[in-house]
Amino acid sequence: MTYRAKKNFVSILPYAVWMAMMILLPATPECYAARTLVTLIILLPCLFYLEHHHGVIHRNSTFKPELVWGVLVGMLVLAIWVWPEQFDWYRKWCIYGDGGTAAVDESEMVYKIVRLLGSAFVISIAEELFFRRWLMRFAGFWLTVALFAVEHDRWLVGAIAGMLYGWLALKKGLLSAIIAHVTTNLALGLYVLETGNWQFW
């Protein structure tokens, strides 16, 4: 396998495993925890390989500007994600299905913690490796935005988030996009736990 093929493979693998397990396993707290754990076990060596052999995460900029840009854009995406829910037209036309379930609030606290950590620190990073590290190079900016949008039930704000994360990856580096996505998912999870707006999960 060539260096490029290896780099592409480890960029795709964590997200592919996450999606495969999501499709194949039932939507239960236990299966979500298993999916998070398996993906994390795969994600960590993939991140190490990309950084150690190719420097694709931390290239061409210092850490502090990436952190600032990532946090700012991440919080902006959070606001964009939550704010439109108040409008009937948005809930009718811009959300697939029922827009989430309220059953999560009946789950055990352990599951809530796993859900928060999995969303913030596992799937967000796996998505950035797949969409911004690999797919955007292969398919281009706008097709990546479109595919990122349809992956989410809230497709309109998903598209906006995809544009912002993609812009960060291009202008500030992949690490900045990862920090933004982690910030959004972590802050959204804390918002859900605080307010009980379980539809966002």
Identify the residue ranges that each predicted region occupies:
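Juxtamembrane/transmembrane-helix boundary motifs at the membrane-water interface
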Residues: M19-C31, K92-C94, L190-W201
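Juxtamembrane helix-loop-helix connectors linking adjacent transmembrane helices
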Residues: H54-S124, M136-R137
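Transmembrane helix-loop-helix hairpins at the membrane interface
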Residues: V104-W201
